[in-house]
Amino acid sequence: MDERRPDLAIQFIPLTYLGIPIPYRGRTGTEREKVAKTYEEINNRIKTGEAVVMTAEEVVDLVREKGAERAAEEVDVVTTGTFGAMCSSGAFLNLGHADPPIRMTNIRLNGVEAYGGLAAVDTYIGATSLIDPPGTGYGGAHVIEDLIAGKKVHLVATGPGTDCYVRKSIETNISLDDINEAYLYNPRNCYQNYGIATNTSDRTLYTYMGKLLPRMKNATYSSAGTLSPLLNDPHLDTIGMGTRIFLAGGEGYVSWQGTQFKTTVEEVNGVPVGGSRTLAVIGDMKQMDPKFVRGLDITGYGISLAIGIGIPIPILNADIMRNCAISDEDIYAEMVDYSLPSGRKCMQRYNYAQLRTGKIEYEGKTIRTSSMSSLAGARKVANTLKDWIEHGEFLLNEPCLSLPKEGKLKGLKDGGQ
């Protein structure tokens, strides 16, 4: 992790949308005043090793014991984490020019198609792209994992041949050390909550939520609950463009709102009960750790990429601390029937404490539950990020642009004008 650059944390233009600065009374004041800190103060404490950092799980009991305002005085940063399937992910690669050069228009990496519609040797490989011929359980996500793990990947590329790019084909092996830039750019990661999937039909369903047994014999969900990044900052008061994050074992940044970003989902206890806000993120693959990146073959569905993402929440005031103290008992998700091709409606709501027991009750029926995301992985992410901050290796960035406060989804019209 020697390549991490804490100095990058101060290069973004600061905003005041996070609140009008209020003088911070410090840790030794005797009067109880409203807690107000700044990014600069927190970063200075990180640099000197004085910052108090806790994970989102750890602060739940602290706030219950001392209240949000007292806890906000004591804690500087809360770390979050999630580790689960994030299909809307991929990597930009610059493969370098051969001699003689080629303008690549058809590109395959380990047999997986990559996009050839960029400049001569730039490409984007999507996580869900399939190997040709399909059926081996390998795809773009596995290519990304292999590259991050330091493995060689077989490149085959062709082009039309032009006066300036005379070559028409090339075949070689590449690794991250051999190519120029390589970075993840994921258009939609870090979903703010998600639904619970079950199956009321008489046949087994194979979905991106896993294998759903007939007649509601099981239900699956996908969230880190208490640790989930966007559930700890539900209205994105501290998360925006330029926020520095833990991405796949390296450092990354929030680059924009994620696709399918919406704010119209009903909230319970201050957080949405279904998929709501999302993030687009970017990071240097050459800094990443293969322990936090996994190519997935989801039976009967296809390929996806599991990624570990952690976001530090600066405790600027008591309201932010109060948001970070949300527990699994407070976070609800809606169960829906995936056997319905459309018009899926909520059957019942359950909180994550109930889901994590391994079973729920629905109209007198006991349903087994399991998670599509890794709670152990989420904890590893949050604790690793905590360790980085405590050792002064990771500073916080104030966003240079806030993400939308309102967002609605549009559906695709079938045959529409």
Language-model segments: which ranges?
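Long alpha-helical, hydrophobic tracts
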Residues: 12-117, 417
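Conserved mixed alpha/beta catalytic, RNA-binding, or beta-rich assembly cores of soluble enzyme
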Residues: 67, 75, 104-402, 407
